Swiss-Prot record:
Its cofactor is Mg(2+). Pathway: Cofactor biosynthesis; ubiquinone biosynthesis. Keywords: Cell inner membrane, Cell membrane, Magnesium, Membrane, Transferase, Transmembrane, Transmembrane helix, Ubiquinone biosynthesis. Its main location: membrane. Catalyzes the prenylation of para-hydroxybenzoate (PHB) with an all-trans polyprenyl group. Mediates the second step in the final reaction sequence of ubiquinone-8 (UQ-8) biosynthesis, which is the condensation of the polyisoprenoid side chain with PHB, generating the first membrane-bound Q intermediate 3-octaprenyl-4-hydroxybenzoate. It is found in: Cell inner membrane. Pfam families: UbiA (PF01040). The gene is ubiA. GO terms for biological process: ubiquinone biosynthetic process. This is 4-hydroxybenzoate octaprenyltransferase. Belongs to the UbiA prenyltransferase family. It is a multi-pass membrane protein. GO terms for molecular function: 4-hydroxybenzoate polyprenyltransferase activity. It comes from Histophilus somni (strain 2336). It catalyses: all-trans-octaprenyl diphosphate + 4-hydroxybenzoate = 4-hydroxy-3-(all-trans-octaprenyl)benzoate + diphosphate.
Amino acid sequence: MTIFAKDKLIAYGQLMRLDKPIGTLLLLWPTLWALYLAEKAMPTLSVLAIFIFGVFLMRSAGCVINDYADRHIDGKVKRTSLRPLSTGRATPREAKWLFIVLVFCSFLLVLCLNLYTIGLSVIAVILAFIYPFMKRYTHLPQFFLGAAFGWSIPMAYGATIEALPLECWLLFIANLSWTVAYDTQYAMVDRDDDLRIGVKSTAILFAQYDNKIIALLQIITLIFLFSVGYLSQLNNRYFIVLAIAGLFFVYQCRLTKNRDRESCFNAFLNNNYFGLTVFIAVLFGI
């Protein structure tokens, strides 16, 4: 079977999660928040296109390296047992080359930006590479994911104003808290399997306090987003829409109350609407 056979291409697409765009959206929203907040207006179409394509490529690369790192684990977990590397539809060598190609394409995009952003992109690649391996060594892999998913924020500021003001880092912390919250919801789905095979996560670390800590992280997210709006001198419409966005967190807390797998997964998916609503708040506020 050649590497370009139909079955192989389908397997590569599944490695990149082309059939599951939620991760791309969760990475895209904070990137858009940052681009519009840094400019206080719509960014140039070229910068916007570079970041949108970059988000797609780097999220895809992250999924590929994640499956490579978990290739001996995924087959033991119900939700991931049919992934391409677990079933042999793609080989580890093919996954490594796919990761390299995706990162290389991302780097070509970054070369269209300023040197400031090119320098920041190196950290993005490092974070994307090390995150999947953290679940073997620490119960805090979600924090590494938060840093990886949030690094597009300083890159967005660097690409537009070549500076990293306080509001950039407040936005980064807001996104970090949000990411840890929703990825803990995601980890709650696999908690029983992870305990059995020895994989670490915040869902395991937080134990019976998981819902309370998720709620605390969501409150921190909102506080920092309100702070960003204040420092950026956004108008009142931003704060009104942001308050509406907070209602999604209330709904998610209700979903995860009984820790049912399907409900926890639905709570995770619901974060797409939170990210979208915050973006709408930014558009109304600038």
